[in-house]
């Protein structure tokens, strides 16, 4: 049987062929056009209804569900637990790749690699000006309030510093224009100090003066000495380009300016919490969310034994571990567990030995490597001590970059040298392992993080 199907003519989603309506017994051409227009309107309304329904489904089952899950976790916590947002450098890396036309180079290099060849030369100009940003940075954004009127601020939760600072209404630099500003005149609990101070970070400097006021984190409030920042020019362009207002330091007192106790220690000093410790839990399934708990340990965030490693430094959350990758070994290496690093940083010599014969591609001018996601040669990191063994498989240090090319991954491993061989165990490590930062016992606790709560 010969069945012929007539293909209708569509333009911009609307039916325009009159033959579509030939089956209707209508003689009046004006009525025919009215009906045709009615069908077009009906089509638009139907399309809008479907799209609205789809949007609502995504909102209800993805965004809202994630918020509900977070609220449920916070509500059922035994200790002060706050949710925070995670922003890392991967988007900036991909933007740089596209802006400077490295995408084709990477794809071509992969094709060479698949053919058993190696592409060693970058074909661009040696004068190509690529803006080098700090690709290893990652930012954990948490919210807190200052003043008895609870002026809201978004803070970087930084284990590498120990002071708390907020931008002041007295700030005159451009970076403060888009920030929440602290106004001491609106708080009845404000105490004047006025001591001038300058804070230095890897990304730059800020300056201002000390003040004291009520600081609220979650449901806990305490009088606390902090810095009102009035000049952020030395912190540009980082400050203007980021969404945080200030920094909440979670490091050690000896790192602080003005010999101020870290806020977690001060909470214990004022009998607000039982233990001077905090923990980080980063869900594997959600790269943009994390949980900070202060004063105690939420056992539902981890499974198996919780192993403690003693600190070997009085400034940093630094421990001693033996590092193994295949037959490459570095005994008694310093390992800093850091909430502000998006990668695993490795001594350069160690990294170069590790990458030999692994079929990876160095991206020109940028401190990272690309490979095929299914590369079976990629090794597992092993960090060991007398107390425990901590492994990091490729699935944890690989970052998919499908928009550069199908099946491509970036290694979240960066070569970085210190005077003494040191590893920084950043985001990849902290996603596999639940971490405890214990001031009281001067140690870091490590346990396997639960994948599903």
Swiss-Prot record:
Pfam family membership, one: Asp
Active site: 158, 338
Listed GO biological process terms: hemoglobin catabolic process; proteolysis
InterPro entries to which the protein is assigned, alphabetical: Aspartic_peptidase_A1, Aspartic_peptidase_AS, Pepsin-like_dom, PEPTIDASE_A1, Peptidase_aspartic_dom_sf
Peptidase A1 domain residues: 140-447
Keyword annotations: Aspartyl protease, Disulfide bond, Hydrolase, Membrane, Protease, Signal-anchor, Transmembrane, Transmembrane helix, Vacuole
Family from the record: Belongs to the peptidase A1 family.
Assembly, per entry: Component of the hemozoin formation complex (HFC) composed of falcipains FP2A and/or FP2B, plasmepsins PMII, PMIII/HAP and PMIV, heme detoxifying protein HDP and falcilysin FLN. The HFC complex is involved in hemoglobin degradation and detoxification of heme in the food vacuole during the asexual blood stage.
Function: During the asexual blood stage, participates in initial cleavage of native host hemoglobin (Hb) resulting in Hb denaturation. May cleave preferentially denatured hemoglobin that has been cleaved by PMI. Digestion of host Hb is an essential step which provides the parasite with amino acids for protein synthesis, and regulates osmolarity.
Protein name: Plasmepsin II
